[in-house]
């Protein structure tokens, strides 16, 4: 048994015919020497159904993210550029699920060796692109929080597009072994990777290779970035910042929280997969039907991660939430008429609250100033009683809207004889 994937149940007990290592579109070979009819029924009906549901949800969610970023963002930010590439990788990652569901339902690969190689290569490229994008996003968060001034000229949308293109190229280079060794070997009916002799050494080396470059290496960089961010935030926690700096820092913290949530979900969904495969290299896992559900869950989690990212964006980002509403509720005239009061999707809810608080504080300051002027006017022995300034009266009318219906003269008299 090699790199886990319950895409088909091998009926052979020969180790040489076991499916090969590729996450996650390799087959789970040798689950048992003779699978039960009940196990075949579950594999042929329930598993394809789960894959198709995940595929539909993932395609719809990531398509919505791509549309919102491209249509409802006038000038995409650096983070939005990376989110766009992450959503594109997740969407292409979902395209391999129908082939996987067909192999589960039919118990063999019906699409030929060329499609096997193409599907596995595209699947691998998008898998590595996802983790590489998360790594780049974490580095971007580090630069934005720890070195905001020095990194300003590098943290631009054109630079982010160049970095994203480099990420796709790097992913294509990393999966070259998949292009070379994947296919449908003679005498077998499943799509997997066929290694030269010694096959066990090649298989173990490839598992370590993919785990190091596709998970543990990037995870180390991500953890280092957020460790430095925490140190920076704690060291600057007691400083007094100007209002503009405070607003920018709050915005950076919101974006950082969203990126951390996406990274945490990725680790949660992919960690069991890689850990179980590394354990399988050291000590072969049990090949019993009782463990089939566990193996399926471990392999299904990475696909579920790709369809869960849009949900995270909707919950954690106000701009994406507003963009989703504009797209999904577009036919409603009522919602459309209320859109201008909500504001553009690039504006966060917290920023609206900050502006409202700022306006209230400014109005409060004006009110205090007005009260001081009114008290000076009403003091006995001053000449201000006979000629109160019109500017004071107009401001008092704004502060006292219930008196707006009276004339200007009466308002002035009320101010004079308070």
Swiss-Prot record:
Disulfide bonds join 116-191. GO terms for biological process: cell-cell signaling; G protein-coupled receptor signaling pathway, coupled to cyclic nucleotide second messenger; hormone-mediated apoptotic signaling pathway; negative regulation of cell population proliferation; neuropeptide signaling pathway. One of its GO terms (cellular component) is plasma membrane. The keyword Glycosyltransferase does not apply. Its main location: membrane. Phosphorylated. Phosphorylation increases upon somatostatin binding. Residues 1-21, 335-418 are annotated as: Disordered. It is a multi-pass membrane protein. The modification Phosphoserine is found at residues 332, 337. Residues 348-360 have a biased composition (Acidic residues). Residues 70-79, 139-161, 232-257, 317-418 are cytoplasmic. Keywords: Cell membrane, Disulfide bond, G-protein coupled receptor, Glycoprotein, Membrane, Phosphoprotein, Receptor, Transducer, Transmembrane, Transmembrane helix. Glycans are attached at residues 17, 30. The modification Phosphothreonine is found at residue 348. One of its GO terms (molecular function) is somatostatin receptor activity. It is found in: Cell membrane. Residues 361-371 have a biased composition (Basic and acidic residues). The chain crosses the membrane at residues 44-69, 80-101, 117-138, 162-181, 206-231, 258-279, 294-316. Belongs to the G-protein coupled receptor 1 family. Homodimer and heterodimer with SSTR2. Heterodimerization with SSTR2 inactivates SSTR3 receptor function. This is Somatostatin receptor type 3. The lineage of its organism: Eukaryota, Metazoa, Chordata, Craniata, Vertebrata. The gene is SSTR3.
